[in-house]
Amino acid sequence: MPKLRSATSTQGRNMAGARALWRATGMKENDFGKPIIAVVNSFTQFVPGHVHLKDMGQLVAAEIEKAGGVAKEFNTIAVDDGIAMGHGGMLYSLPSRDLIADSVEYMVNAHCADAMVCISNCDKITPGMLMAAMRLNIPTIFVSGGPMEAGKTKLSDQLIRLDLVDAMIEAADPNVSDERIDAIERSACPTCGSCSGMFTANSMNCLTEALGLSLPGNGSMLATHADRKELFLKAGRQIVELCKRYYEQDDASVLPRSIGTFDAFENAMSLDIAMGGSSNTVLHLLAAAQEAGVDFKMEDIDRLSRKVPCLSKIAPNTNKYHMEDVHRAGGIMGLLGELDRAGLIHKNTHTVLGMSMGEQLDQYDIIRNQDEELHKFFRAGPAGIRTTQAFSQDCRWDTVDNDRVNGCIRNKENAISQEGGLAVLFGNLAEDGCIVKTAGVDESIWKFTGTAIVFESQEDAVAGILGGKVKEGHVVVIRYEGPKGGPGMQEMLYPTSYLKSMGLGKKCALLTDGRFSGGTSGLSIGHASPEAASGGAIGLVRDGDIINIDIPNRAINLEISNDELAARRAEQDQKGWQPANREREVSFALKVFGHFATSADKGAVRDKTLLK
């Protein structure tokens, strides 16, 4: 029978000093011997997705204590990618993921916690906590802060729905008036919560459902809705139940590595492909799989992308649907239900509810279960009131959206496309693969041949786009922005947004060893591996080279001979794999990250071989 980890510091005569300190935190005599559960919060006033989380930790903690556990809360950092975007702050975003994972490990192991409830929400916080959960392998439940309501404003006598990407695109368009930009800016982000589309934050919170590590509704229930409170309360109760099952009944099926199996990672990736999620999820799932000891690779993602259809098109891929609409259509359980009916998920995986995924779908899929309370749960909708308060409204749609022909979530027969919303491309420009979010690419440019225009940094690319250097037919190559080369693997939301602002959204492609925001759409290909700083062929491209992109055949190639490629490689080996004439101040902390970072095909995790 597994022994409580916390017994190390709560039991035995020689732990009198530790117990004295525990007592100073409020523990009583009868608390020693109960599971100590870490409530891992991420409240900050810097991030709208986390600004409402201040009281959530104590909400969960109170429920844990009612159920027979001892709750101890601590906080992690949280970076807002949207605020950090477009300047040097973005260099810190991806490294913060690993810092979060490490800090959770440090706190939990230093204090011998028995279990965790992870209260996350935004882009790198959920992945960082997920990596920590897989690394620590103690009972864990995720509960996120929830999505923001979609922005809405009236322009030209027409009500339109918005998100932060609309503000960025319009602001860079010289033909748009200041008054229009001001109206969009003030309306784009109306409430607390993670940005309202299927961007990275919401994609990752949805994937925790598919992995089985969070409760149904976690990825889609609005941050402002009163029903979300029950997810926090239930997480507090359920984590104590998981502790009992593991520590008292020796049931290891409740542990993260038992839940996060290869099949569970396939389920999560299949969901991501079906919903056209952020390409960043590829990076984070690969990293989490490595922490879990699961051999899940780019080749597996490529295989899944060829058979899983795209069943939903959500902002930023359309302005018709946002996360509030996904929830109305049955949320992630609705999407997984359609994948199940298509024979495309594994139903035997475990979940934190103690059920198999198949059993959970029987209970929570609105198509197969007509229970009135279930449908009421998925009718939870927006209030349209600006607020930073969680659980502040109880508005509901009149009906759920169960239209699987033309609705927000489609069935396989009526799929938006029979191939999924993400694709892996291979070729001499990316021997280890690169990623494109096909759900955001107009089918007219799924095959694209263009002329390379090369930039050694995101900043130079932005200047080139806004300065008119980038023309129709160009493939914009932004290199030395990978995990090692940046360092930090910046997101390229500004370059892709500015291409749209300049009327080039369907007339150009963009290739980078950096990554993209979940808000990116267009022919934007990222994660080119190996990256330039690791000797990848993207570092050998020259202005005027012809690049051929073929999404249907999953290919991306530089149209030069093998002899020419080899000659360029030999020349670059002599020069060194570093950007030419780039001025960038890089802190010691970022240099450490870059020194250990692997390329994106490995999840940009640390290269452990460097420690041997």
Curated annotation (Swiss-Prot):
Active-site positions on this chain: S517 (proton acceptor)
Cofactor(s) needed for function: [2Fe-2S] cluster; Mg(2+)
Residues reported to bind [2Fe-2S] cluster: C122, C195
EC numbers: 4.2.1.9
Cofactor annotation remark: Binds 1 [2Fe-2S] cluster per subunit. This cluster acts as a Lewis acid cofactor.
Pathway the protein contributes to: Amino-acid biosynthesis; L-isoleucine biosynthesis; L-isoleucine from 2-oxobutanoate: step 3/4; Amino-acid biosynthesis; L-valine biosynthesis; L-valine from pyruvate: step 3/4
PTM sites of type N6-carboxylysine: K124
Binding site for Mg(2+): D81, D123, K124, E491
One Pfam family recorded for the sequence: ILV_EDD_C
Presence of the UniProt keyword Magnesium in the record: yes
Keywords: 2Fe-2S, Amino-acid biosynthesis, Branched-chain amino acid biosynthesis, Iron, Iron-sulfur, Lyase, Magnesium, Metal-binding
Biological process annotations from GO: isoleucine biosynthetic process; L-valine biosynthetic process
Gene3D superfamilies according to UniProt: IlvD/EDD C-terminal domain-like
Catalytic activity: (2R)-2,3-dihydroxy-3-methylbutanoate = 3-methyl-2-oxobutanoate + H2O; (2R,3R)-2,3-dihydroxy-3-methylpentanoate = (S)-3-methyl-2-oxopentanoate + H2O
GO molecular function, one term: 2 iron, 2 sulfur cluster binding
One Gene Ontology CC term in the entry: cytosol
Principal EC category: lyase
Source domain of life: Bacteria
Keyword Hydrolase in record: no
Family the entry assigns: Belongs to the IlvD/Edd family.
Subunit structure: Homodimer.
Purpose of the protein: Functions in the biosynthesis of branched-chain amino acids. Catalyzes the dehydration of (2R,3R)-2,3-dihydroxy-3-methylpentanoate (2,3-dihydroxy-3-methylvalerate) into 2-oxo-3-methylpentanoate (2-oxo-3-methylvalerate) and of (2R)-2,3-dihydroxy-3-methylbutanoate (2,3-dihydroxyisovalerate) into 2-oxo-3-methylbutanoate (2-oxoisovalerate), the penultimate precursor to L-isoleucine and L-valine, respectively.
Record protein name field: Dihydroxy-acid dehydratase
Native organism: Haemophilus influenzae (strain 86-028NP)
